[in-house]
Amino acid sequence: MFGKRKKRVEISAPSNFEHRVHTGFDQHEQKFTGLPRQWQSLIEESARRPKPLVDPACITSIQPGAPKTIVRGSKGAKDGALTLLLDEFENMSVTRSNSLRRDSPPPPARARQENGMPEEPATTARGGPGKAGSRGRFAGHSEAGGGSGDRRRAGPEKRPKSSREGSGGPQESSRDKRPLSGPDVGTPQPAGLASGAKLAAGRPFNTYPRADTDHPSRGAQGEPHDVAPNGPSAGGLAIPQSSSSSSRPPTRARGAPSPGVLGPHASEPQLAPPACTPAAPAVPGPPGPRSPQREPQRVSHEQFRAALQLVVDPGDPRSYLDNFIKIGEGSTGIVCIATVRSSGKLVAVKKMDLRKQQRRELLFNEVVIMRDYQHENVVEMYNSYLVGDELWVVMEFLEGGALTDIVTHTRMNEEQIAAVCLAVLQALSVLHAQGVIHRDIKSDSILLTHDGRVKLSDFGFCAQVSKEVPRRKSLVGTPYWMAPELISRLPYGPEVDIWSLGIMVIEMVDGEPPYFNEPPLKAMKMIRDNLPPRLKNLHKVSPSLKGFLDRLLVRDPAQRATAAELLKHPFLAKAGPPASIVPLMRQNRTR
């Protein structure tokens, strides 16, 4: 009982210790230093992308504490408030929304198995596997979701944040930072801005004239969509904060803006928060009091969820998908790969939390565009679902990854550059013919199959033009790829995609877009004020590639070539087969 206490085991200090790795963070360069080689591709590739610039005044507001309601199938429960919302959606046309369109072509009939997947996806017009999603900094798996029949609408809840959740504010980008996929800026127009805003003095290269009298183009509801610009003075690149007051003057932005400098437009009339709407209608109506029913109303989370329920498929994808593995993040959600239980096929699943969206109405684009416009050079969507408070989009999985990895770490020859441009222009020519503007063309949005085929993805921020709405005005996109007329807040059309494609060609030649060592706001000012950017390695390209680029990067959008015209350019005759891209993917994997 009182035996001798056991001798304490002595553990020696480490012997022959060598400190081989020391990792730190350079605050000036905003990047990690001394990373082991194995970690570099995991951390640097996503950490170097500049964050989107967001105006918090126009972030979709949420009304917590709404009563929970059961949604069955694909129909929403029609209480009084929801009935008004759904009636608005049914009567909505492209004039009032770029997402919900009455004139959308009907989705093609495709035979589906019980698990919701097409029976023969390879036989569709698409032609092959693709990739889903884009990079970003939002995370959060669904915690609750009903079965394939009944589905509970979850109330407000706190979700675990990703370890790398993106900040809403801007960041200065060093040379090795790349922007997230998604809309970076969208600036609402406060009412009462002085008309006839002139470009700043000392802009010898800007050929865009300002209208002497800018007529307001936006009513009390909806996104501004007519041709007359009424934005702030482009000369100062003054991006006003959203306000319902007509007396706030625009402020000149200096350096990296504050989080409230830039923000998205409200695209859908009934989904726009009141802070983003002007105080007075743009066009005076007939005399008489306004009907209170016509005033924009705040749409609760439950109402928005019920409206989204109408365009997605019923059921729960977890009933036929297994082994979800997160492979990336986008500006709207996370991207996972999953396995179809019955066949073992890999698919990509993009999960977007309705409560974490900068502009939740743009989620309709994630479903509608890929569903309605099918092409062999556009990523194919299989199904879409509401799982709890998340929109899940099931798409084909693209094993080759994004073009960004190739342009950053390898050098492409002209045969390979032409092959990428040909595929992208074939997709854009179809989309532009239908009045769809992508608005975020860049290497991040170009995805590759395992055999080198090129596909266009990331349709969450596209817009629709038509005879009713021939031009758009929202400031949406990634700064370094934006067209000058878009930055100048002039009305634009599909030609902004052509400019962005030209910047992507520079990416493929030089490895990065122009002004990439500048902060986003300064880069936008330089794009707006300067001559079209030139290649750094101009001496290394052929005259045909230079001539092709000169047709893309034209400051006057009226003189810029269309996608259909560019498909006839001699440079595209150099395009190699998809197999010519495979060595680049192999080289990137073995680096």
From Swiss-Prot:
<feature type="binding site">
    <location>
        <begin position="327"/>
        <end position="335"/>
    </location>
    <ligand>
        <name>ATP</name>
    </ligand>
</feature>
<feature type="modified residue" description="Phosphoserine">
    <location>
        <position position="41"/>
    </location>
</feature>
<dbReference type="GO" id="GO:0005925">
    <property type="term" value="C:focal adhesion"/>
</dbReference>
<protein>
    <recommendedName>
        <fullName>Serine/threonine-protein kinase PAK 4</fullName>
        <ecNumber>2.7.11.1</ecNumber>
    </recommendedName>
</protein>
<feature type="region of interest" description="Disordered">
    <location>
        <begin position="95"/>
        <end position="301"/>
    </location>
</feature>
<dbReference type="InterPro" id="IPR000095">
    <property type="entry name" value="CRIB_dom"/>
</dbReference>
<feature type="modified residue" description="Phosphothreonine">
    <location>
        <position position="187"/>
    </location>
</feature>
<feature type="active site" description="Proton acceptor">
    <location>
        <position position="440"/>
    </location>
</feature>
<dbReference type="GO" id="GO:0045766">
    <property type="term" value="P:positive regulation of angiogenesis"/>
</dbReference>
<feature type="modified residue" description="Phosphoserine">
    <location>
        <position position="104"/>
    </location>
</feature>
<dbReference type="GO" id="GO:0007165">
    <property type="term" value="P:signal transduction"/>
</dbReference>
<feature type="compositionally biased region" description="Pro residues">
    <location>
        <begin position="271"/>
        <end position="290"/>
    </location>
</feature>
<feature type="modified residue" description="Phosphoserine">
    <location>
        <position position="148"/>
    </location>
</feature>
<feature type="modified residue" description="Phosphoserine">
    <location>
        <position position="258"/>
    </location>
</feature>
<feature type="binding site">
    <location>
        <begin position="396"/>
        <end position="398"/>
    </location>
    <ligand>
        <name>ATP</name>
    </ligand>
</feature>
<comment type="subunit">
    <text>Interacts with FGFR2 and GRB2. Interacts tightly with GTP-bound but not GDP-bound CDC42/p21 and weakly with RAC1. Interacts with INKA1. Interacts with SH3RF2. Interacts with RHOU and PAXI; the PAK4-RHOU complex protects RHOU from ubiquitination and acts as a scaffold to suppport paxillin/PAXI phosphorylation.</text>
</comment>
<dbReference type="GO" id="GO:0005524">
    <property type="term" value="F:ATP binding"/>
</dbReference>
<dbReference type="GO" id="GO:0098641">
    <property type="term" value="F:cadherin binding involved in cell-cell adhesion"/>
</dbReference>
<keyword id="KW-0547">Nucleotide-binding</keyword>
<dbReference type="GO" id="GO:0060996">
    <property type="term" value="P:dendritic spine development"/>
</dbReference>
<dbReference type="GO" id="GO:0005737">
    <property type="term" value="C:cytoplasm"/>
</dbReference>
<keyword id="KW-0723">Serine/threonine-protein kinase</keyword>
<dbReference type="GO" id="GO:0035556">
    <property type="term" value="P:intracellular signal transduction"/>
</dbReference>
<feature type="modified residue" description="Phosphothreonine">
    <location>
        <position position="207"/>
    </location>
</feature>
<feature type="compositionally biased region" description="Low complexity">
    <location>
        <begin position="242"/>
        <end position="260"/>
    </location>
</feature>
<feature type="region of interest" description="GEF-interaction domain (GID)">
    <location>
        <begin position="298"/>
        <end position="323"/>
    </location>
</feature>
<dbReference type="InterPro" id="IPR033923">
    <property type="entry name" value="PAK_BD"/>
</dbReference>
<keyword id="KW-0808">Transferase</keyword>
<keyword id="KW-0963">Cytoplasm</keyword>
<keyword id="KW-0488">Methylation</keyword>
<feature type="region of interest" description="Linker">
    <location>
        <begin position="25"/>
        <end position="320"/>
    </location>
</feature>
<keyword id="KW-0832">Ubl conjugation</keyword>
<feature type="modified residue" description="N6-methyllysine">
    <location>
        <position position="78"/>
    </location>
</feature>
<dbReference type="Pfam" id="PF00069">
    <property type="entry name" value="Pkinase"/>
</dbReference>
<dbReference type="InterPro" id="IPR000719">
    <property type="entry name" value="Prot_kinase_dom"/>
</dbReference>
<feature type="binding site">
    <location>
        <position position="350"/>
    </location>
    <ligand>
        <name>ATP</name>
    </ligand>
</feature>
<feature type="modified residue" description="Phosphoserine">
    <location>
        <position position="167"/>
    </location>
</feature>
<dbReference type="Pfam" id="PF00786">
    <property type="entry name" value="PBD"/>
</dbReference>
<feature type="modified residue" description="Phosphoserine">
    <location>
        <position position="267"/>
    </location>
</feature>
<keyword id="KW-0067">ATP-binding</keyword>
<dbReference type="GO" id="GO:0043408">
    <property type="term" value="P:regulation of MAPK cascade"/>
</dbReference>
<feature type="modified residue" description="Phosphoserine">
    <location>
        <position position="291"/>
    </location>
</feature>
